[in-house]
Structures are given as structure tokens and as C-alpha cells.
Design a protein with these regions (language model features):
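Beta-sheet repeat architectures centered on beta-propellers
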Residues: 16-31, 37-182
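Surface-exposed extracellular loop regions of Gram-negative outer-membrane beta-barrel proteins
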Residues: 1-14
């Protein structure tokens, strides 16, 4: 807050720590975590570089020209921040890197990190378990036919659910039928 006439202002608090893509940042418990072009960072009042034991593995093969595809998510069930990203030879997000922010890093000076390869699902969005009992995510399907989300959870039970938002049908009833909302 800077007062009249501008009310609010911006103050630069870090350098060489910019965001790699608009969806590559997440906030949990007042701390922001993000993936930059050259490392992982957090902000809790000051910018911190996150020591990362897998940083070379991630950044030696990431396609930084596809930064807008990178997305971040939180898994509160395991105190994890997850980033999905494309590798140099991939068209879509084919890998992920996970940071466990809840573990005591005194015994792990490089932090608690692990990586994985997306073999069955190319993640593009994620919502934490604060809304539902478990996290929900979507996957990208590059086939040339239309695709619809497979919903895991209370009502989806792994079934493909068809939403026709263009014509107003967006309610799926427990018996599988749809109701047009007007």
C-alpha cells in the first residue's frame, strides 16, 4: 500500500528468478512456490532458491520454449508441490518433478525431491484435495477425435463423462443421465 493517488505499488524483491510459465506457480500456507527458467523458488516474505537434488535432470532436458505448458499443483495429502513439464523432444508435458515442502530439510540439504515420467496421462490442470477428498487432474489427449474427461471421484468412478456446455447440458445425474439446465 503506497497511498493516494496510486493506492498500491510494486516492489522488486528478486532477480533471475522469473516464472517459466503462467501456470508454473502455486501458493500453499502463505508460501508461493514456482518454477523458473533456471531453478525452483519460494517466497515467504523473501525470495528463496530451493536447493534441488534433481535440478540437473530436469533442466538438462526441459523445453523452455514451451513454458506456457508447464503447470503446477499441490497435493496436500503428502505436502507436495508438483510441476508437469515437456522435455526437449516432447510435444506435451511428459515428465513431472515433485518437491515435498513438509519434510524437515535439516537432514536433506538438497530438499526432498523426486521425478517421474507421464506414461499414461499428460497432465494439464490440477485441483487439490481441499475441494474433494482426493486431488482431481485432467490429462491431454492428442488424438484427432473429440475427447472428454475421465472423472475419478465420488460420482465418476473412472467413467468417461460427457459435458455439452455449448447447448447447456452440464449436469450429470447419479444414474448417468444428463439434465439440461436452463
Amino acid at each position: 500500500f503506497v497511498g493516494a493517488p496510486f493506492t498500491f505499488g510494486f516492489e522488486q524483491v528478486g532477480t533471475n528468478c522469473g516464472l517459466i510459465g503462467k501456470n508454473a506457480a502455486i501458493e500453499i500456507d502463505g508460501v508461493a512456490y514456482w518454477m523458473g527458467n533456471n531453478g525452483f523458488f519460494s517466497f515467504d516474505g523473501t525470495v528463496n532458491t530451493l536447493p534441488c537434488s534433481v535440478e540437473d535432470y530436469v533442466y538438462d532436458d526441459i523445453d523452455t520454449t514451451k513454458g506456457q505448458q508447464i503447470c503446477a499443483g499441490i497435493n496436500n495429502l503428502f505436502t507436495e508441490v508438483i510441476w508437469w513439464y515437456p522435455t526437449a523432444n516432447a510435444t506435451f508435458n511428459d515428465r513431472y518433478v515433485v518437491y515435498n515442502y513438509g519434510q524437515d530439510n535439516a537432514n536433506l540439504p538438497m530438499g526432498n525431491w523426486y521425478t517421474g515420467v507421464n506414461t499414461n496421462s499428460i497432465r494439464t490442470t490440477w485441483i487439490d484435495s481441499l475441494v474433494y477428498p482426493k486431488p482431481y487432474a485432467t490429462a491431454f489427449n492428442s488424438s484427432n477425435t473429440g475427447t472428454f474427461p475421465v472423472i475419478q471421484g465420488e460420482t465418476g468412478l473412472g467413467q468417461t463423462v460427457f459435458f455439452e456446455h455449448e447447448i447447456g447440458t452440464d449436469q450429470i445425474n447419479p444414474d448417468g443421465s444428463t439434465t439440461a439446465l436452463t
